[in-house]
C-alpha cells in the first residue's frame, strides 16, 4: 500500500499527518481495517515520501496496533525499517549531483528548493504544479547529459510539486523485490499514482480508487483487480473491506 491511504480531506477522529504545506488524514475506518489485516497479512507501505515524511504515519499506525512488516520510501530508493535500511543504489553521490546542478542551473528554470529529507535520491520542490511540470523536462535533459554530468543512468518524474531525480532502475517494484523476494508477486496492493504502475502490473491482486490516473485504472482493470466505486477515505475503506472479505 502507498500514500493512497492518506487524503487531504479532514475527517473526525482521523490520524493527522503533518505536511510541508498541508496536513493529510488517515480515517478511523481505514485504521481499523489495517489493524485487522495486519494480524493475518504482512503489511508493507511503499511511498514516494521520505522517512521523515512517513514517520508520523508509521508511528501513529503502530500506536493504534497496526503491525508494519516493512517500508519502501523515496519511491523505492530505500527499503527496510528505521535502523536497518537497505539503499538500492548506495554508490550514488547525490550531493555531488546536486552541487553540479546548482552550479549549472539555467536562470530560465522555474524556482525550486531541494528537499533535504531525501537521502537516496534528489527531490526538488517547485512552488506550483505548473512550475514542476516545466522543471521536470529540464531536469531530464540535464540528467541525461552522460558526457558532462556526474551521475549516469537517471530517471526524472514529477509527483505533484516534487520533481524526482532517481536511478533509472530504482522503483517501488524493485524495492518490493528486495524486501519480500518471490513473495512480492503474490501480493495484494493498492495504489493510485503513475509511480505505482511499475508494481501494480506485477502483483497478483492490484487495486485502486475511483478517479485515479487513467493509466493506473487501465492496468488494474486489465489484471482483474479491485476498483473502488469512490475516491478518498471512503474509497480506501472500501478496498480494505473487500480485501478483508477475500482473505477470511
Question: PLM ranges: what are they?
Answer:
Residues 20-24, 48-49, 165-168, 184:
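Short, flexible loop segments at the rims of nucleotide/cofactor-binding pockets, characterized by
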Residues 58-60, 135-141, 213-222:
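Short, aromatic/basic amphipathic alpha-helical patches
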Amino acid at each position: 500500500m502507498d500514500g493512497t491511504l492518506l487524503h487531504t480531506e479532514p475527517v473526525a477522529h482521523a490520524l493527522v499527518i503533518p505536511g510541508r504545506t498541508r496536513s493529510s488524514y488517515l480515517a478511523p475506518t481505514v485504521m481499523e481495517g489495517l489493524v485487522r489485516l495486519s494480524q493475518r497479512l504482512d503489511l508493507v507501505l511503499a511511498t514516494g515520501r521520505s522517512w521523515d515524511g512517513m514517520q508520523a504515519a508509521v508511528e501513529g499506525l503502530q500506536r493504534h496496533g497496526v503491525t508494519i512488516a516493512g517500508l519502501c520510501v523515496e519511491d523505492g530508493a530505500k527499503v527496510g525499517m528505521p535502523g536497518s535500511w537497505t539503499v538500492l543504489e548506495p554508490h550514488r553521490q547525490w550531493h555531488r549531483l546536486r552541487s553540479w546542478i546548482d552550479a549549472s542551473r539555467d536562470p530560465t528554470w522555474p524556482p525550486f528548493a531541494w528537499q533535504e529529507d531525501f537521502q537516496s535520491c534528489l527531490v526538488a520542490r517547485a512552488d506550483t504544479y505548473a512550475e514542476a511540470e516545466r522543471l521536470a523536462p529540464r531536469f531530464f535533459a540535464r540528467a541525461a547529459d552522460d558526457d558532462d554530468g556526474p551521475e549516469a543512468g537517471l530517471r526524472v518524474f514529477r509527483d505533484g510539486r516534487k520533481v524526482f531525480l532517481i536511478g533509472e532502475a530504482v522503483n517501488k517494484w524493485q524495492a518490493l523485490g528486495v524486501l519480500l523476494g518471490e513473495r512480492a508477486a503474490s501480493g495484494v496492493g493498492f495504489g493510485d499514482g503513475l509511480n505505482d504502475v511499475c508494481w501494480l502490473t506485477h502483483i497478483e491482486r492490484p487495486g485502486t480508487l475511483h478517479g485515479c490516473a487513467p493509466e493506473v485504472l487501465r492496468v488494474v482493470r486489465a489484471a482483474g483487480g479491485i476498483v473502488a466505486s469512490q475516491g478518498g477515505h471512503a474509497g480506501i475503506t472500501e478496498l480494505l473491506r473487500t480485501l478483508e472479505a477475500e482473505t477470511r
